[in-house]
Amino acid sequence: MSTSFENKATNRGVITFTISQDKIKPALDKAFNKIKKDLNAPGFRKGHMPRPVFNQKFGEEVLYEDALNIVLPEAYEAAVTELGLDVVAQPKIDVVSMEKGKEWTLSAEVVTKPEVKLGDYKNLVVEVDASKEVSDEDVDAKIERERQNLAELIIKDGEAAQGDTVVIDFVGSVDGVEFDGGKGDNFSLELGSGQFIPGFEDQLVGAKAGDEVEVNVTFPESYQAEDLAGKAAKFMTTIHEVKTKEVPELDDELAKDIDEDVDTLEDLKVKYRKELEAAQETAYDDAVEGAAIELAVANAEIVDLPEEMIHEEVNRSVNEFMGNMQRQGISPEMYFQLTGTTQEDLHNQYSAEADKRVKTNLVIEAIAKAEGFEATDSEIEQEINDLATEYNMPADQVRSLLSADMLKHDIAMKKAVEVITSTASVK
């Protein structure tokens, strides 16, 4: 293989590389065997056409595209490695020449990782809007949340108030015509929860079981159903039940209901204080780490960050998000309909975060390189065991999912983050 690289602009260039016949011939054989079973020729059973007959009838050139797809990935990676390039986006491949019996020549337009000029990243002084302190009010608030979670809904003989739950039937119409999705039966609605269109819940305050209420609202201009956006609607609403929350007394019995490992309310407060202090400590450390990394990135200069890196990160984030949606049974079409957004809106939503994440990774990688951080065998093994514990899977499965290079990269990145944060101080 012969390779060359022509620089076209900052972080951009063209690789030219060749593929030898000793690689091409086996690929042509594979391409032929792939289609052989479907070939017919007079005098031969289906799937038994000899290669010379095929070449004479169709020409060997018809196999070139499939053969190229077989040999290209390995040949391209070998060229990148030989040239010592750090390519960061999908290449644009072009065929320069593909002649029978000769080596093939291809070109690849590539984008390379930008130069990072590091600034200060050690002994940084940062400000954080976080505290390690836990107050009595914090403990009481946590207990109150648990107390509210244990509340029971009981039938209320009287008017509905904010915070009460009403069980309703409703039928919505616009200009006297009912619309899809505007009807519900025995729907439980907590007043003040904001589940329904603004103004809907407020008009049920004061209603009693058995009442029929005409609720008049206007759909927001940004409503996901475009045919309803900005339109006035009427909902004929029947109140079946009014329910109110009955919360348990704040006493030792409540404490035992919340946590079976405590005997008194005071025990629960002590336990919750320890939990909150641990959580606050973690949140504080995370805030310091985030602020220090952000400052280290701000102190660095990234020379001509390629847009392709941002686009790839946005696409990765969007694909991950939509994959999570589909695992919950929500298709892309359904998501965009429910949210009233578009594919472009979703990409724009992730763009700013993608830009920040790409720059952060580049700077941390540059710090790891500047410090000469590498991973030892024992550190790799420890990382595998830690991941196995975190994701509750066998260590061998982790090894099969992650390459040694990926693990080495992650460990070096962690060491770089550690050198930033361990030397940082809070103003």
Curated annotation (Swiss-Prot):
Read off the InterPro entries from this record: PPIase_dom_sf (IPR046357), PPIase_FKBP_dom (IPR001179), Trig_fac (IPR005215), Trigger_fac_C (IPR008880), Trigger_fac_C_sf (IPR037041), Trigger_fac_ribosome-bd_bac (IPR008881), Trigger_fac_ribosome-bd_sf (IPR036611), Trigger_fact/SurA_dom_sf (IPR027304)
What is the designated name of this protein? Trigger factor
Q: Which reaction does it catalyse?
A: [protein]-peptidylproline (omega=180) = [protein]-peptidylproline (omega=0)
Residues covered by the PPIase FKBP-type domain: 163-248
SUPFAM superfamilies from the entry?
Answer: FKBP-like, Triger factor/SurA peptide-binding domain-like, Trigger factor ribosome-binding domain
Q: Name one Pfam family in it.
A: Trigger_N
Q: Which gene name does the record give?
A: tig
Q: What EC number(s) would the UniProt record show?
A: 5.2.1.8
A GO BP entry: protein transport
**Role summary:** Involved in protein export. Acts as a chaperone by maintaining the newly synthesized protein in an open conformation. Functions as a peptidyl-prolyl cis-trans isomerase.
- Organism placement in taxonomy: Bacteria, Bacillati, Bacillota, Bacilli, Lactobacillales
* Cellular component terms per the entry's GO annotation: cytoplasm
> In Gene Ontology terms, what is one molecular function of this protein?
peptidyl-prolyl cis-trans isomerase activity
Name the UniProt key words of this record, in alphabetical order: Cell cycle, Cell division, Chaperone, Cytoplasm, Isomerase, Rotamase
> Which Gene3D superfamilies has this protein been placed in?
3.10.50.40, Trigger factor ribosome-binding domain (3.30.70.1050), Trigger factor, C-terminal domain (1.10.3120.10)
Which cellular compartments is it found in?
Cytoplasm
Source organism, top-level taxon: Bacteria
Presence of keyword Cell cycle: yes
Keyword Cytoplasm listed? The answer is: yes
Entry text on domains: Consists of 3 domains; the N-terminus binds the ribosome, the middle domain has PPIase activity, while the C-terminus has intrinsic chaperone activity on its own.
Its family remark reads: Belongs to the FKBP-type PPIase family. Tig subfamily.
